[in-house]
Swiss-Prot record:
Zn(2+) binds at residues 176, 178, 189. It comes from Serratia proteamaculans (strain 568). Residues 105-227 form the MPN domain. This is UPF0758 protein Spro_4842. It comes from the Bacteria.
Amino acid sequence: MSSQGITLWPDTLAPREKLLRYGASALSDAELLAIFLRTGFPGVHVMQLAEQLLEQFGSLYHLMSADHSVFCSHKGLGNSSYSQLQAISELAFRFFSSHLAQENAMLNPRMTQHYLQSLLVHHEREVFLVLFLDNQHRVIRHQEMFAGTISSVVVYPREIVREALKANAAAIILAHNHPSGKAEPSHADRLITEQVVNACLLLEIRVLDHLVIGRGECVSFAERGWL
């Protein structure tokens, strides 16, 4: 029996056809993964394989960040798939980095969120990161400022202001992760944000947003009207 590839599917079911007709954003995680995998193996359709892998790993993120040996231990995956997926992940990260260094980060908040998610979501402890922006809101650099435990991180507003001055930043975006996976901000998150905003105001440095990164989700203080 031959491998069950996408080319054997009816057009109405083929992810490639759906992508060309409606765009990549119209596809589910499983459909995107099926395009990457190309074929299944005897008795298992490529779409079935994609769905099985997402169920086994728990999410697309956990699949893409899996250890090499763990990744290759799953039937249908191997060194070639691992190398290609890591290359795709790195290309996406470099694309975000390059774009944000040249464009206004606030013109495409979703891209900024994806970029910050790629920086923070793999951490098993809370990490507080700052994006330093110029007066056109282009990214100068990012810095992981503080690291904490699995449930909290201590943040010092003075240190953030000091680094902003070093970077000659006109504005900043704050971000930190919740290793629990739930992105809903805590009362402490709102309090420290207020403290950072007040510290930056004294030097006319704007805090444009504070993003809380969970597993597959992100909460923006700016979008909620908290800044």
